[in-house]
Amino acid sequence: MKFAVLGAGSWGTALAMQLSRNDATVLWGRNKAGMEAMQKNRSNEQYLPGIKFPEKLIIDADLVHAIEQSEAVLVVCPSHAFGDILQQVKPLLGHRPLAWASKGFEPGTGRFLHEVADEILGDAVPMALVTGPSFAKDVAMNKPTLVAVASANKHKEFAKQVSLALRTDNFKAYLSEDLMGAELGGAVKNVLALATGIADGMELGDNTRAALMTRGMAEMMRLGDALGCKPETLMGLSGLGDLVLTSTGDLSRNRRMGLALGRGQTIDEAKQTIGQVVEGIGTTDEVMRLAQKYKVEMPITEHVWKVVHGELTTVEALSDLMGRDLKPEFG
């Protein structure tokens, strides 16, 4: 299946490279000059310097032409741009199915991205999500990686096609029919990675990181239960797997943001240092809205939110969390 990958950042480029190891794949991006440079260099020097493209990767700065060449579309963009991209794609899609590899919620509304896609495209369009523990650089360098491809039950055949299109000796995509659970895990882990990053930036030690990841996972599970997600989804690649990677790997933007905050930088200073979108900042607002709506206790998430919004310092947040009343670990 020939894909058009829409979004030429690090993750979009890496997924386009992975797909093109099997079949011709088109990579589209908004920045015409940037796309021309990619075509000339046969690499994405801005985000993945020095990693050469496979021969079957086609660079195209024309959205209409990119989609016309394809049999399916894969959207890879920040969550805040997801709806806008789908509006552009809608009149061009025809009978093509659509997948996405974006994580987070629609800013302001807190809607899951599959809800945004259903509203714009209609639920008759086959759709699937690619998610899980996968740094772009490792995928681009063809290092062994496992992800999940999630879809609604009625679209499971398309999810299987996506999985097969991505499959190589070093890349495997497991199938899931718990789309909401897969989306939730991929979003909440960004908030928890901020927490572990803050703790590591404060040099609180390995015990603290382990505690935050474990108790943070409990928060994810409680919210998932309230939303009707399958617990095994959150304990799998799209939940626990992604949490482990994002909370411990220094390629994670959310972890690096947390590290910067823990070392005393402001949000604006940290954003400038990282230079790319940090999904966890906006996602914190949306996870808090969900927690309040469903009356789910999420103290780590709440304290990250307070730090991000300047209501607490990192030291105050730590003291507040450690001072919480003693209670059973489970229940």
Where are these regions (language model features)?
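NAD(P)-dependent Rossmann-like dehydrogenase/reductase catalytic/cofactor-binding core
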Residues: 196-200, 225-235, 239, 243-331
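Internal alpha-helical scaffold of NAD(P)-dependent oxidoreductase catalytic cores
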Residues: 81, 92, 116-126, 144-194, ...
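Rossmann-like NAD(P)(H) cofactor-binding subdomain of soluble oxidoreductases
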Residues: 53, 59-144, 162
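General beta-strand structural signal in soluble alpha/beta enzymes
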Residues: 100, 126-131, 173-177, 236, ...
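NAD(P)+-binding Rossmann beta1-loop-alpha1 motif at the extreme N-terminus of oxidoreductases
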Residues: 1-51, 58-61, 88
